[in-house]
């Protein structure tokens, strides 16, 4: 199964991330985001960041997760290439704990692709068939 694929949206880019589990699909969504910004195959897993978020449903959880990744990228000036996600469900909704690994951006070494301005809710979806599919669009 492919990890993710992109689709065209006017002035934006969308992606569908896949996984056998919800966690794996979220990890692949993180990889998809950072492959829009740079080629993650050249990003070393030197620095570790962890965060936890809670959201009322799976779609809101996906949005909040992607927003947090973008926030850490912008504030810490980092690229990430390794994602470990744990998701739990309760009566209040969903909780996500993520450990992500990457390194400080070095544009002399890292390929600069596109700048992500924002994560959007437009067409965002979490779907379970024989596997999980997460769909999101980012504003470039």
Language-model region placement:
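N-terminal intrinsically disordered, cationic/polar leader segments
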Residues: 2-140
């Amino acid at each position: 199964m492919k990890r993710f694929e992109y689709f065209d949206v006017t002035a934006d880019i969308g992606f569908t991330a896949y996984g056998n589990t919800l966690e794996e699909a979220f990890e692949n969504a993180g990889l998809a985001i950072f492959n829009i910004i740079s080629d993650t195959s050249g990003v070393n897993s030197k620095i570790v960041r962890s965060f936890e978020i809670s959201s009322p449903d799976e779609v809101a959880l996906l949005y909040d997760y992607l927003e947090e990744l973008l926030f850490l990228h912008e504030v810490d000036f980092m690229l990430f290439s390794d994602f470990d996600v744990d998701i739990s469900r309760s009566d209040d909704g969903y909780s996500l704990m993520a450990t992500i690994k990457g390194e400080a951006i070095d544009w002399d070494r890292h390929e600069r692709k596109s700048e992500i301005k924002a994560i959007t809710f437009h067409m965002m979806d979490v779907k379970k068939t024989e596997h999980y599919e997460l769909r999101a669009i980012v504003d470039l």
